[in-house]
């Protein structure tokens, strides 16, 4: 009764909120599809971000393909032109260098994505010359020019010091010096530059064969000479009918490769044929800056402090041996203890130690191969090892890369150096061969000494070719993350810029090199280089951070590609 008489509350009870019905459709409901509702706020944010990023990447990739296809179609007519069986396509030499503080893979990816498709569509032959250490491009260009000068002087070529051992290089230099002395003495000797003759000559000079044709019987010598002359005439006839295209070209990808290429031109035409530094300076290790891992870590402040190595086992054994020699009474106790364990070899070793000092290093090295002994012992090459001696778990000996030779001439010495006498004649022969072949490609001279026939030699001599500079902008650093993200979503602009520059190198005109403006091509890329890397380069005298010094005499006949109908290059 008390409950019935209790006064009711005047406040109304809160009713439950009605459930959202969402989108209902009888047809969907008949198919068993649940009610469709809008996602929650958090899911809306998530899908918006994912959709925006995915859409941006897809749109940029789609536009990039369109731009690439546009430039491929612009040069496709060159690839569709019929090529004769004896016609050699035009060759382009591409120089690539890793970006500062990073690896070579980035610039190679840049080449394969934006440059290679256009060269392939134009059916051009191209050779990529890449460097892993600073200075290699400069040395390759300079050494190519020096070998050309040696060839014009009648001297043998010297192999690249990056590809041969120091002994082989010194041997080649000695042979060249001997040839110079022979020419000075006025003696004449028949030298055949034919590769086939040189190959057969190397076979005849093998161990067990006569060292020279003079030591052969007269019949064998006559047969050898007749066969050589016939092979030489055949090669000459085939070469005379080949349709070489002397209109080659050079592409420098990035500011660093361009600076090294210009330095190589000056070193080759103005520098001496041989390294002016003494031999002891050449044997010193050249600083591999900046594209070695240790230099990258140093430039980025990631170098770890060296940790002191623990005492080696040999030093421990030596200290024990000295202690036993100074306390003979301990040897007897140790011998008795070991004799109870049955180790007779250990007793003998201890007794020998008590008798006198033992060469612990040699004995330990023979049984345990300690680090101290293995460092002093030169490892035997795998080719000289027998199957029983070879240990597959043993570490291979470290292969040290040959150092990059330093420049033969410094930039401040350009003005005082004398230009090579073969500079003007080389460019004139190259231009004459190009004009003759372009005017009548089907008419080939029979005489290889004529200017047009000499164009065959200029296919490999890229340093006479016009230059095209293609940008490669690469930025690093955490503070540059917003700029890196913006560039990532705008790679279509890179494809447009690089594609236009590549098409200019394939189909564009040429103009003389401008010593006032052209040295600053792609100078804006230097602002993207890491500041720590640049500072270290300035301290170590890096070639990349030095200002570009050009000589009017060297760049007088050098050409630069430009778009057709334009007076100035836009690649700045």
Curated annotation (Swiss-Prot):
Main location group: mitochondrion
Keyword Iron in annotation: no
Mitochondrial matrix compartment spans: 1-42
GO biological-process terms attached to the record: protein transport
Record topology, Mitochondrial intermembrane segments: 60-572
Pfam families with a match to the protein in the record: Tim54
GO cellular component, one term: intracellular membrane-bounded organelle
Subcellular location: Mitochondrion inner membrane
TM ranges: 43-59
Function per UniProt: Essential component of the TIM22 complex, a complex that mediates the import and insertion of multi-pass transmembrane proteins into the mitochondrial inner membrane. The TIM22 complex forms a twin-pore translocase that uses the membrane potential as external driving force.
Name of this chain's protein: Mitochondrial import inner membrane translocase subunit TIM54
């Amino acid at each position: 009764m008390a409950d019935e008489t209790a006064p009711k509350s005047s406040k109304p009870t809160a009713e439950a909120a009605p459930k959202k019905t969402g989108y209902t459709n009888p047809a969907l409901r008949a198919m068993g599809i649940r009610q469709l509702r809008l996602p929650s706020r958090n899911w809306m944010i998530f899908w918006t971000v994912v959709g925006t990023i995915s859409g941006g990447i897809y749109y940029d990739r789609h536009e990039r393909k369109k731009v690439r296809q546009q430039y491929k179609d612009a040069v496709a007519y060159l690839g569709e032109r019929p090529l004769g069986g004896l016609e050699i396509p035009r060759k382009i030499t591409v120089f690539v260098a890793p970006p500062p503080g990073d690896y070579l893979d980035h610039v190679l990816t840049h080449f394969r994505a934006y440059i290679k498709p256009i060269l392939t569509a134009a059916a051009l032959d191209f050779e990529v010359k890449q460097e892993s250490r600073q200075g290699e491009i400069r040395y390759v260009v300079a050494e190519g020019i020096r070998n050309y000068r040696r060839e014009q002087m009648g001297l043998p070529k010297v192999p690249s010091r990056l590809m041969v051992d120091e002994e082989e290089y010194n041997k080649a230099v000695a042979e060249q010096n001997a040839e110079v002395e022979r020419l000075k003495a006025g003696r004449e000797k028949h030298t055949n530059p034919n590769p086939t003759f040189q190959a057969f000559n190397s076979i005849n000079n093998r161990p067990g064969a006569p060292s020279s044709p003079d030591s052969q019987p007269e019949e064998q010598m006559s047969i050898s000479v007749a066969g050589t002359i016939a092979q030489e005439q055949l090669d000459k006839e085939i070469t005379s009918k080949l349709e070489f295209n002397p209109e080659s070209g050079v592409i420098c990808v990035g500011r660093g490769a361009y600076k090294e290429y210009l330095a190589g031109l000056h070193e080759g035409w103005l520098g001496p044929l041989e390294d002016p530094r003494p031999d002891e300076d050449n044997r010193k290790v050249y600083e591999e800056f900046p594209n070695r891992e240790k230099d990258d870590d140093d430039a980025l402040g990631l170098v770890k402090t060296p940790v002191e190595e623990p005492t080696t086992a040999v030093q421990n054994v030596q200290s024990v041996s000295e202690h036993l020699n100074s306390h003979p009474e301990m040897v007897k106790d140790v011998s008795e203890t070991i004799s109870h364990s049955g180790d007779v070899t250990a007793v003998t070793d201890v007794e020998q130690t008590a008798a006198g000092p033992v060469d612990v290093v040699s004995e330990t090295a023979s049984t345990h191969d300690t680090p101290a002994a293995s460092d002093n012992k030169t490892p035997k090459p795998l080719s000289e090892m027998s199957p029983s001696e070879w240990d597959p778990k043993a570490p291979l000996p470290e292969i040290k890369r040959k150092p990059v030779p330093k420049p033969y001439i410094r930039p401040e010495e350009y003005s005082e150096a004398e230009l090579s006498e073969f500079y003007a004649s080389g460019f004139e022969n190259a231009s004459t061969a190009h004009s003759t072949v372009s005017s009548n490609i089907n008419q080939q001279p029979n005489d290889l000494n004529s200017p047009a026939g000499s164009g065959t030699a200029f296919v490999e001599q890229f340093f006479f070719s016009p230059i095209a500079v293609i940008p490669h902008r690469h930025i690093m650093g955490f503070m540059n993350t917003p700029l890196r993200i913006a560039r990532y979503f705008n790679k279509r602009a890179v494809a447009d810029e690089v594609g236009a520059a590549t098409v200019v190198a394939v189909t564009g005109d040429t103009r003389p090199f401008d010593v006032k403006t052209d040295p600053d091509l792609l100078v804006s890329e230097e602002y993207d280089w890491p500041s720590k890397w640049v500072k270290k380069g300035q301290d170590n005298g890096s070639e990349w951070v030095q200002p570009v010094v050009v000589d009017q005499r060297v760049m007088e006949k050098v050409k630069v590609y430009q778009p057709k109908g334009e007076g100035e290059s836009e690649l700045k």
